[in-house]
Regions:
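Regulatory N- and C-terminal appendages and interdomain linkers associated
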Residues: 1-21, 257-271
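An alpha-helical support segment within catalytic cores of ATP-dependent transferases
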Residues: 9-20, 123-163, 173
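Conserved catalytic-loop position in the HRD/HxD motif
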Residues: 164, 169, 181
Length: 271
């Protein structure tokens, strides 16, 4: 994957971003992400910093940037970075967020980060119910659940779900766990966000049984219909089978690992 840099942006657009954010220093590259967009951090005159991401307007992923901006405009205050600015001009889509000083959590067995993450996930949904983003699609239309049609009712709900809770979309800072990158948000039942975390725990080294024990600490997951969770495990595994060979190399490698985790989870659920 060829990652674009700050210098790839037109000079006029760079000045617009700098002025709008009241930046006081150079744009420093930020590593990470599965997209080829620009990712930089910029110091501001208020003593804080902004995280800026940008992608050409013609890129297939530009729509996700626009969706992420639209969702963030509706989110209530909470454990997530504030949207500071958005620009859709000069053939680029640019988003600027409050920079969160923190680290990605360790989800491995025995990690002290695990209870922090689980508590944060449990607290995430009440402020997002009812769903504040009117254009959020129901999760029953997500490609993950194509094989789980008999369990659509258990997946329905009016909570805004993150739908991509992974270690790299979480930051632990001075004020707890923050959820970043809301581009895939859907509307549905709160247990789904927890179910999506289960394969991530398996990827981090947990057995499927242990991963489910941790997930069950969240009431929404503990109270979810057992057969719906099993159908979901099967569906997400099928989804990764279909997607394992797609995307940029980094994403393909992740999806192949996720597929192994999904198969282990499905086998455990159907034992």
């Amino acid at each position: 994957m060829t990652t674009r840099t700050w210098d790839d942006l037109p000079p006029t657009l760079r000045r617009r971003i700098t002025d709008q954010l009241a930046a006081t220093g150079p744009a420093e590259p930020v590593a990470g992400g599965f997209t080829p967009g620009v990712r930089v951090q910029m110091p501001q005159d208020n003593g804080r910093a902004a995280f800026v991401k940008a992608i050409p307007a013609g890129d297939p992923l530009a729509g996700m940037y626009r969706t992420e901006a639209a969702i963030n405009r509706t989110l209530p205050p909470g454990p997530r970075p504030r949207l500071l600015a958005e620009l859709d001009e000069h053939d680029w889509v640019v988003l600027a967020f409050e920079h969160i000083e923190g680290r990605h959590p360790d989800l491995a067995p025995g990690s002290p980060d695990l209870p922090l993450v689980l508590d944060a996930v449990a607290a995430l949904h009440p402020p997002l119910t009812p769903n504040p983003y009117p254009n959020a699609p129901q999760f029953t239309g997500h490609p993950v659940v194509a094989q789980a049609a008999d369990h659509h009712e258990a997946m329905r709900g009016d909570t805004l779900l993150h739908c991509d809770i992974r270690s790299d979309n979480l930051l632990i800072g001075d004020h707890g766990v923050h959820f970043v990158d809301w581009a895939l948000a859907h509307r549905g039942a709160p247990w789904l966000d927890v179910a999506l975390l289960v394969p991530q725990l398996i990827l981090a080294g947990h057995t499927p049984e242990n991963a489910e024990k941790h997930a069950s600490q969240v009431p929404a997951y503990r109270d979810a219909p057992d057969n719906a969770i099993t159908a979901f495990a099967s569906s997400i595994t099928t989804y990764w089978v279909q997607r394992a060979g797609q995307g940029v190399p980094e994403l393909r490698r992740y999806r192949k690992r996720a597929l192994r985790a999904g198969r282990a989870w499905e086998a455990y659920r159907r034992r």
